[in-house]
């Protein structure tokens, strides 16, 4: 397979000079200039000519053009207006790409899927995510329960490691729980910082998140479930009791009931949030309705 291409230092620099483009640090702009990394991302995504693909932050189109070669339709969200004319040039050979100049965090993604990808058999997200908003993007998409089969996304290595972290490890936290609630997580490859222009300060990690047919644990109130998981990690070194004392309204007068709720859920009050797994948090969430005086 022949990759022509934007994803080389020479071609990227030529485009930068041609358009007088200056990187905005506030937008976390680091353009990928390595075709081998892109090839691995495409292969991990497993897309074909029946697939619809959502890309977030296409930059100059280095990944986008390869997605266009493999997918039925590509829908790219780009927040930076200055990149729109560049993308108009670099993606001009492809009639199966739509670029929307919009912030993905504010976009109506469900409506966009219905408008642009309705004729595709399956929907995938494939993207080099901006470091500074990786978590809001991922959680925003996952929590919307969109009909997305899988996500192959590149992010800061440290953040990527959190996604697959297990209990009682340093990387484990509320993000690990939330992502594993919705998906199976697989690490694909570490990407060195030198394959970007400009290079970021840290290495990256490509991960594949395959959406589960149903969430990993049965939860009656997802909003409460996520409040409890986030609340358990506000201060990692504190016990689950102390963190929830800070989370629950009028907790001092309800302390005995909080302890009772924890113990009835099979969670010792002296444990730390990092030691609990998804089933533990599901049990806490589902049992809380039996204690109506405990309000978050």
Curated annotation (Swiss-Prot):
Predominant location category: cytoplasm
PROSITE patterns linked to this entry: RRNA_A_DIMETH, SAM_RNA_A_N6_MT
Residues bound to S-adenosyl-L-methionine: 30, 32, 57, 78, 103, 128
Catalytic activity: adenosine(1518)/adenosine(1519) in 16S rRNA + 4 S-adenosyl-L-methionine = N(6)-dimethyladenosine(1518)/N(6)-dimethyladenosine(1519) in 16S rRNA + 4 S-adenosyl-L-homocysteine + 4 H(+)
Oxidoreductase recorded as keyword: no
Subcellular location(s) of the protein: Cytoplasm
Pfam families membership: RrnaAD (PF00398)
InterPro entries named among the record's database cross-references: KsgA/Erm, rRNA_Ade_diMease-like_C, rRNA_Ade_Mease_Trfase_CS, rRNA_Ade_methylase_Trfase_N, rRNA_adenine_dimethylase, SAM-dependent_MTases_sf
Keywords recorded for this protein, A-Z: Cytoplasm, Methyltransferase, RNA-binding, rRNA processing, S-adenosyl-L-methionine, Transferase
Disulfide bonds: none
Entry's EC annotation: 2.1.1.182
One term under GO cellular component: cytosol
Entry GO MF terms: 16S rRNA (adenine(1518)-N(6)/adenine(1519)-N(6))-dimethyltransferase activity; RNA binding
Keyword Nucleus on entry: no
Family from the record: Belongs to the class I-like SAM-binding methyltransferase superfamily. rRNA adenine N(6)-methyltransferase family. RsmA subfamily.
Protein's job: Specifically dimethylates two adjacent adenosines (A1518 and A1519) in the loop of a conserved hairpin near the 3'-end of 16S rRNA in the 30S particle. May play a critical role in biogenesis of 30S subunits.
Record protein name field: Ribosomal RNA small subunit methyltransferase A
